[in-house]
Each structure stands twice: as C-alpha cells, then as structure tokens.
Amino acid sequence: MAKIILRHLIETPVRYEQEFEARGLEDCRLDHALYALPGPTTVDLGKARAAQAPPVDAAEMPPQRGESRFQVLLDVVQFLPEDIIIQTFEGWLLIKAQHGTRMDEHGFISRSFTRQYKLPDGIETKDLSAILCHDGILVVEVKDSAGTK
C-alpha cells in the first residue's frame, strides 16, 4: 500500500500544476528536478526556478541582521555530544561522529558518519557557532558579524 501512495504522490501533476502552466512541456522534460525523489539536497521547484532567474535587485541585497549566511542542520540524535567532532581545514567544514558498539532491540550496532561542506568565500573559522539542540539536531552556522542595517 505504501508503494501505491508514493507512486500517487510522485505521478500526480496536480502537485505542480502551477509550475507546469508557466513552463512548456519540453522544458519540463529537461528539468531533472521534477524526477528527483524528495531528499535533503532536493530543492523546491519554485525555489529552483527563482534561483535560475534571480530578481535584478537580489545581488544587491545584503543578508539581514542576524540572518545566517551559511547553515548546516544534521540529525545526530543517536550520538552523544562527546561523540561528535567539528573541524575546519582550508575552507572546509568537517563534521564526524562515531560511537562504539551498543546493544539495541535488534542486537549490536555501531554508527559513524563524516560530512564535508565547502565554506563560502569570506567566512572565517572564528565566526562558526555550533549548537546541539535538545531534539538531537546539530546546527552549525555562520552569522553575519558585521551589523548590516
């Protein structure tokens, strides 16, 4: 039954009716974002189209005060704070986590992951802040240090 529901959500053009009306059929066939399954790297169609044709004044708008210029959200609920390592090296942010073998309801399990992110130009390591939320979400972000008006 879940397979039918998933197929229905993916194959239903009503979800993207406004997107299809504004674009031609051939343009939609060439847009690979329409065929991608939702995931952490899949961009909303409206946002993707806006990114392809940004408004004229978008390049002139600086980030708002307190608005993040760079942000990473990771679900690390299975790891203790001491299991997580955050490093920067030559413009890259490296996040690693690993815990030893533990017993769970199915037997023994051990987990680990490594994520690398390229920091945007002009971002300094000292401006990074990391917060581990109570719900297990790790937030690493760089805030605008120069108070823009």
UniProtKB/Swiss-Prot annotation:
Xref: InterPro entries: A-crystallin/Hsp20_dom (IPR002068), Alpha-crystallin/sHSP_animal (IPR001436), HSP20-like_chaperone (IPR008978), HSPB3 (IPR033894)
Family annotation (CDD domains): ACD_HspB3_Like
UniProt keyword terms in alphabetical order: Cytoplasm, Nucleus, Stress response
Annotated compartments: Cytoplasm; Nucleus
Main location: cytoplasm
Gene Ontology CC terms: cytoplasm; nuclear speck; nucleus
Domain sHSP: residue ranges: 47-149
Job description of the protein: Inhibitor of actin polymerization.
Family to which this protein belongs: Belongs to the small heat shock protein (HSP20) family.
Record-linked PANTHER family: HEAT SHOCK PROTEIN BETA-3
Stated name of the protein: Heat shock protein beta-3
